[in-house]
Amino acid sequence: NFVLKLTSSKATLEFKYLGYQDKTMKVTQKGNVDLGTIALSLDAKTLGDVVITSSIAVARKTPVAVTTLAPEFIEEKLGTQEFPEILKSTPGVYATKQGGAYGDSKINMRGFKSENIAVMVNGIPMNDMEWGGLYWSNWAGLSDVTRSMQTQRGLGASKVSAPSVGGSINIVTRTIDQKKGGSISYAMGNDGYNKLLFHVSTGMSKDGWALTLLGGKTWGDGYIQGTEFSAYNYFVNIAKRINDAHQISFTAFGSPQWHNQRSNKDGLSIKGWQAVKNYMGDKSPYRYNPTYGFGPNGERMSASHNEYHKPQLSLNHQW
């Protein structure tokens, strides 16, 4: 509801809203005028369907520089590393932990930053729609649900998100092909690193249904001062094989997390580096965090803190 006071008996009102067509109404009466309910028509240009298709390059057949990582390789080599670090051995890919905090890794491909690398999960672009990059801390649980991971180096085109000038990374998650069974695992590492994970799958039933559930928690103190972290991850996949030619699957996954950070932009002078070495004592000076300290009650605090949850829901029809 709104009330407008006009100095003239003639006026033109314009109504605009994102996703709807503009509407113009003229007022020519004197005194109080009731416009009633103002209805805007949908703008078909902005609300049209987006069809996303994806495919995996075939080694020795597709004319693209490509590297494919199988789930066995990821499980054996990843350990307590972050997901992007598994690509360190891939030609043309540079992966680093930046400030060293949980989930703050970044990837450069052929020298290009993440803004020019298309990252997709099941063919759906994950790049941020505003700045084009990607925060890997939002997808901390992807390593536990990945069926295969493929990097394609070289120019690519995208109508939806970031242009893949440097290349593209396509991550395919588990679906109806999972065997019946389950597992519970616990991992631990240095600096209080802990990871608890469970996984269960029904396999495909006689009537074509399959369900896969996965959940876990990762927490620890971090290698760098004041980089404590805690993250949960979940994955749900419900699939139905209608016949030999059609299959429908619903997937939901996410990773609510928080972690303290260390900025990698605040460099130290030579004098400052010497002071840090004296301050840290026998500990490695590489652990020093200038944004870390203690509160009035002795609690550990950090000036840089990140807390986020970016769930993804998708419905796929394969034929």
What are these regions (language model features)?
Residues 140-185:
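A beta-strand signature from Gram-negative outer-membrane beta-barrel systems
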Residues 14-21, 30-76, 114:
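Short, acidic, small-residue-rich periplasmic hinge/interaction motif at the N-terminus
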Residues 96, 156-160, 186-188, 223-225, ...:
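Outer-membrane beta-barrel domain signature
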Residues 59, 84-125, 141, 147:
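Extracytoplasmic beta-strand/coil segments of soluble accessory domains associated
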Residues 131-132, 151-153, 180-183, 217-221, ...:
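Extracytoplasmic loops and strand-loop junctions of Gram-negative outer membrane beta-barrel proteins
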Residues 181, 188-219, 224-273, 304-318:
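Transmembrane beta-barrel wall of Gram-negative outer-membrane proteins
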